[in-house]
Amino acid sequence: MSKYLEYPEVESKEQPPKKLVVLLHGVGSDGHDLIGLVPYIKNYLPNCHFISPHGIEAYDMMPYGRQWFSLQDRSPHIMAKLIANNISKVEDIIKQKQDELNLTNKDTIIIGFSQGTMIGLYLTLVQKEPFCCTIGFSGALIPPMEVNNKLTPICLIHGELDEVVGVSEMYNASNYLSKLHIEHSGHKLTSLAHSIDGRGLEIAINFINNRHCEQQ
């Protein structure tokens, strides 16, 4: 039995699954949040098994919710240290499900929102085996000390009206990825705040379906 909280998941329409989609929620939420997106996208991704793990820590600024790491101090070097300390626990959750489904990183798609994007991008950059692709909604990139993976394509999606994580963070992430020559795209969505809408989901679906993960 897993040492982490049991989380929601949705089986692929086609069996056995060929891909694993890992949904990483924002701070103060939990896995039940992003699993609610699956009914809107699963018909376009019929060979994908979806999991939405709960953050590995209790949210430390409210009596409910989960977090991937504390945001009480948002200094980049502090956040990087906290992520580095916790990233192996996130990897454990993913690896356990990969083993159950007989899949590997090259079959795995990471989708994050807000703090989930922060953990998802960091996770992607430190892998020794590339993920299929990574999508980040409304988040920021906290660079790791060492980048092991430059092969995973990354898609960044951000609302121009976001006042929680400003759209400037998308451009900061894009500049960082460009310097490392990592394939990526950025999409600024008009009239959207800190949220995911149908336009963003369509971009994500197209991005996933345009990947040829098995060739990586």
Swiss-Prot record:
Pfam families in the cross-refs: Abhydrolase_2
Name the PANTHER family for this protein.
LYSOPHOSPHOLIPASE-LIKE PROTEIN 1, LYSOPHOSPHOLIPASE-RELATED
> Which family would the database say this protein is a member of?
Belongs to the AB hydrolase superfamily. AB hydrolase 2 family.
Class of the enzyme per the UniProt entry, highest EC level:
hydrolase
Q: What is this protein called?
A: Uncharacterized hydrolase RC1147
Q: Which UniProt keywords apply?
A: Hydrolase
Instruction: Report which residue ranges the record marks as coiled coil.
Output: none
